[in-house]
Amino acid sequence: MSKHEILVQSVVDAIGDNEFQVGDKLPSINIMVRDVGYARKTIVKAYEELKDRGLVESKNKQGYFVISQETGVVLRVALLLFAFQSFQEDFYNTLREELGKKFQVDVFFHHNNISIFETMITNIKGKYGMYVIAPIQDDAVKPMLQTIAPNKLILVDRYLDLGPEYSFIAQEFENATYSTLVKLLPDIKKYKSMVLFFNSKTDYSPIGIRRAYERFLKDHGIKGSIEENYISGTIKKDTLYFIKNDSILWTFLKDCNQGHCVLGKDLGILSYDDNVLKEIIMGGITTISTNFKEMAKIAAKYVMDGNEIRTIIPTNLISRSSL
């Protein structure tokens, strides 16, 4: 074992034996240099590794303090998502499965709210060895994220340009949505009109989806509109509904069922972000989706080996009977 590894293990053992408890201060770097005889950079490296494991945190000008006695954990990972929607649950479960028990994953949600996002970053910064974050696509959050070292951060789901040194695994929304709508043009033309339910404040929808939809309507002469919310009981036949928000989708499907509407015949439904319910409910819902489990596997690999990754996950059309 190297000197810093010996020091790390000594502190881990001391924490495990309750010699250090949560809230206790570790000996200062200067004291450790004097008493142990190791170089200052060796002590700093050891304390920083203990930070990465989530066992200690550094307080400015005060020193290093014990914050956890979970000594079996190799690395604490902060996962910051939009909300616990079904597809993000798939991401979370896969990430945890891939990392295994030696990695502690703590999940947080920002709900597409910049103020909440800032509070979350402030609260978790410096307390985790790795950060997996689905960012709000707004320039205002860039400085917040750039306070985290590039080798400890990976952006997932949404793309935000933090610079060439930062890793990401993201979806691309505008061109992917547009090309999928073009692919579906023969099916879309079966309907008299099209409605997109889009509300970026409540369903966290990226603006690229709306832009793609508007461009598609214009380019192909399709009659269509955009609604922020669905009002129960307002279903119209011979209409294709493009629904991003799953809460709206479930209410809409309930009304369809009560009104004895046949999907793909009386009206059509196109959704976003696939899950097992959309596969089986009412004969299946046609969905535009990326593979969130694959995204999580790539993110887990980054957490474990730290090799830089900058990639866009393909978006796929999953055709079912709802069109």
Predicted regions and their residues:
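Hydrophobic alpha-helical segments within soluble ligand-binding/sensing domains
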Residues: 159-195, 289-308
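An alpha-beta-alpha
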Residues: 179-217, 311-323
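Extreme N-terminal segment that seeds HTH/winged-HTH DNA-binding domains in transcriptional regulators
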Residues: 1-35, 310
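Flexible loop/turn connectors
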Residues: 247-323
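Flexible loop/hinge segments that line or gate small-molecule binding clefts
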Residues: 136-175, 273-284
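N-terminal helix-turn-helix
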Residues: 24-58
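Periplasmic-binding protein-like
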Residues: 78-79, 128-136, 195-199, 237-245, ...
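Amphipathic helical "hinge" segments at domain boundaries
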Residues: 29, 64-122, 128
